[in-house]
Regions:
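Hydrophobic ligand-binding cavity/cleft-lining segments
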Residues: 1-42, 47, 152
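A generic structural signal for beta-strand entry/edge sites
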Residues: 2, 49, 75-77, 99-104
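Short loop segments at secondary-structure junctions
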Residues: 12-15, 73-74, 98-100
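Generic recognition of short, well-ordered alpha-helical interface segments
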Residues: 13, 30, 47, 64, ...
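Amphipathic alpha-helical segments that line or abut small-molecule/effector binding pockets
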Residues: 16-19, 133, 137
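Beta-strand/loop substructures that line and gate deep hydrophobic ligand-binding cavities in soluble
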Residues: 81-134, 141, 150-152
Length: 152
């Protein structure tokens, strides 16, 4: 059972600022509130073949994901795989400059569910999509708030 999801958001900041904030793992809990820990395991952090462990608290249940960076073209593209016992997810993030100085963040996710999650995913599609949209909106708010607090 697979699911594809594309989310797009316009951020009122230049691409370099968006990338800087997105690329800093210390910022992740600020826009992914269920993230409990991020631990680098191997490779050069943030670069292709780097492996990290992310631990989330999903309604009292610990979900451990292994992130592997698959591609990076700073400041416009970051791709990775995220594996857990419930799913394998490929996420590709594009950051595009607009003519107005904003940044369009386009995220494409391709999920392959495992075990009983193959069945559960049928009922959870809306909540999974909502969660992605909410995380991206929190990131937008983080960037725009930081920019307003620390103008160049």
């Amino acid at each position: 059972m697979g699911m594809k999801h594309k989310t797009e958001i316009l951020i009122d900041a230049d691409r370099a600022t968006v990338w800087r904030i997105f690329d800093d793992p210390d910022n992740m809990p600020k826009w992914q509130p269920t993230l409990r820990s991020f631990k680098h395991k191997s490779g050069t952090p943030g670069q292709p073949d780097a492996v990290s462990e992310l631990v989330y608290d999903e309604n009292g249940r610990e979900v451990v994901m292994t992130e592997t960076i698959t591609a990076r073209r700073e400041p416009s593209f970051l791709g990775g795989t995220y594996d857990s016992k419930w799913a394998s997810i490929v996420i590709v993030n594009h950051f595009e400059e607009t003519d107005t100085g904003q940044t369009r963040w386009v995220s494409n996710a391709n999920c392959r569910f495992k075990g009983f999650m193959k069945i559960m995913a049928l009922f959870m599609r809306k909540s999974i999509c909502y969660r992605t949209d909410a995380d991206m909106n929190r990131f937008k708010l983080l960037v725009e708030t930081e920019l307003a607090s620390n103008p160049s």
